[in-house]
Structure formats: structure tokens, C-alpha cells
Amino acid sequence: MKIKFYTFLLGLFMVNGLFAQTTVIDSIIHDGIYRNYRLYVPAAYNGSTAVPLVLNLHGYTSNATEQQFYGNFMPQADANNFLLVMPNGTRDNQNQTFWNAFGGSGPDDVGFLSALIDSLNATYNVNLNRVYSTGMSNGGFMSYKLACMLSNRIAAIASVTGTMSTIELNNCTPTRPVPVMEIHGTADATVPYNGGTGFTPIPNVMSYWVNHNNCNPVADSADVPNTNTTDGCTAKHYVWSGGDNGSTVEHYKIIGGGHTWPGAAINIGVTNQDFDASAEIWRFFSQYALTGVNAVNELPSKSAFTVYPNPSAEDFTLSFDNTSAKTVTLINAVGQVVQRFTVTGNQVIVSPSAAGLYFVTICLGDNLWSKKIVKN
């Protein structure tokens, strides 16, 4: 995927130049090959606390710079204090940039990305239990390959317009449940939703991970509110929950969507604008660590959290076992914060104004727990 938006990028570089200290351009040598990358360091990072790391992988023929601004996670990194790295792939025999995600011989990109994690951790304070991978197209393929081959290091993955090659699917050997999110358009002509030569259909990919993670076989689903009626597409959100170690599988099906990143400011085809893919991917990632949900998504037992009634046509009551101060955040299906407040009692009521799927997150110290609620 080549993104033709150099004029747009020039303006972004001019703005980013005011804060040049936040983007580091560096490289490592792996297997005798010079491999470079861009690292975005949020202003909140001070090195005193270990922070998550997100790998953001470009598509075929694209590069780290284009991916930084097209699949833009910088607002999420700023708001949530995580490191964001955009590495470059190598060049294939057509002299195009790519990730070796298709099972053939060539550069050891799994080894490179593992070495990159180590290199970054040597310089920065990385929480190695919270390393995630996402990517566009070929970068999505590569994220799936990491889920298969580097599941001991990658806590969760998300693919936008990617899939798994049939070779990789048949040889996938993850050593633990891996939370997976796929965002894909039904009108994607580059990586067809229903598969093609060597490309696994998206429903089959979802089934593989639902089975591997031992999730509930039937998904909860909800239409994403069609807030932008001129973008030429709509979206539906599927969640397979109940997996081992708290794992889930999520899928955003973009009905009529093309080979594009939802919410992107750069239009390279039919792009869904009803939700922000980057915000949703971070919402998904933030629930998980290598140990499952324990490190980032589970309150201590003395602070149990329940929601009732659920589903509800009106209000939801949140109940806690103690009165420790907690931050309550209500997030809608498109990743927007609807409510956020602090509570010190053992009960509080939340009242979403519109029907739909929401996520309630409770933050207590370093712990974050999320539950899904549905307003009828």
C-alpha cells in the first residue's frame, strides 16, 4: 500500500518540528542488515515508570513515516503515556518495502522486531509485559505472524486491512491465548474480506483465534452509530469474550469500506469515519498484558466490581466492595469518552444517553478493569 500524501506530510512535519524531541529516528543492525525506525516518545514519559510499547507496522510499499501519520496513535500515546515505534521493513525483489509475513525465506522480521524490543528496553523503561503490535495491510499480516511466533513477548495484536496467509494460518503455534482485533472493509480490493489466493477469509481468521483462545463461540454484536453519513460505509462491532486468561477476539466489519484506516485524516479510498481505529485499538490493547488481564484489567479481589442490570434500558449501577478512590470512565463503541469521574463510595450509577454498546473502565492505582455494558 503506497500512500500519496507528501504535501500533507510536509505540513505535519512543520508542526511536528516544533516538538522534534518527541520523535527519535534511530537504527539497529540485525542479521547484518541496517534496520531503522521512528520512535514517538510522549511528553509524559520521564523514565521513572515502565510504560507500554506499541509496534505500528506499515503496509506494503509504505514506510515508517507514512504509517506514523496515517495510522496515527500519537494522540493515544500522549494521553496514555506509551512508547510508539514505527519500524521500516526491508525491500523485496521488486525493490518495494515489505514485511516477510508470508512464510517464505527472506529477512527474519520476527527476530528483528524481537531485537528491536530489547534495544528499546535497553534505553527506555519499557513494560515488557505490555508490548503490542498493530499495522496496516502487510503490517497487519506481520502482526498476526508475531501473534503466532512471538506470543511470549506480544501481549495482544490488532490488524487493519490485513489477514493471515494460508501458510501462516496452517503453521501458527502460539504458546498462550492472544487477544486479537481485526478491522476490515468488505469492499477491500487489495486484501479481500472473503479471501483470495493465499489470503485467508476474515471470518476464518476470527474463527481460528476464537477457537485458540477458547472464547465463547457466539459473538456479541452491535452496529456502530452511523455518525458520518457521507463516508460511504457503515460498521458493525463483534466481540467474542470469555477466552482463557481473560482473552477476547474483536472484529470491526466495515460494510462497504475499502483498504483504509478508519478515522484517518488522509483519504485514500472509502474510509469509515464513524470511529477512530487507533483509539479503539488502544482501548483494546490497554486491557491486556502477557499474564492475561491480571496486570492491567483486574482489580484486586478486595475491590470487586459488578454492574447491574446489564443489559439495561435505563441506568447501570456499579458496585464495589470498598470505598477506595477509583476513576470511572464510560467509553462508547467508537472509542469516545462519554463520562469520566472519581468515586470514593461503594456504589455509583452511570446513565448512557443513547442505546448501544459501551465499556466501563475502573482505574484503581496501577490497575485497570473493563466491563462491557449494553443499553437497549
What label would you give each PLM region?
Residues 218, 289-308, 314, 321-323, ...:
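Residue-level detector of functionally pivotal "anchor" positions at catalytic/ligand-binding pockets or at interdomain
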Residues 330-338, 358:
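Short, glycine-anchored, charge-dense loop/turn motifs used at functional sites
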Residues 355-376:
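C-terminal tail/sorting-segment detector
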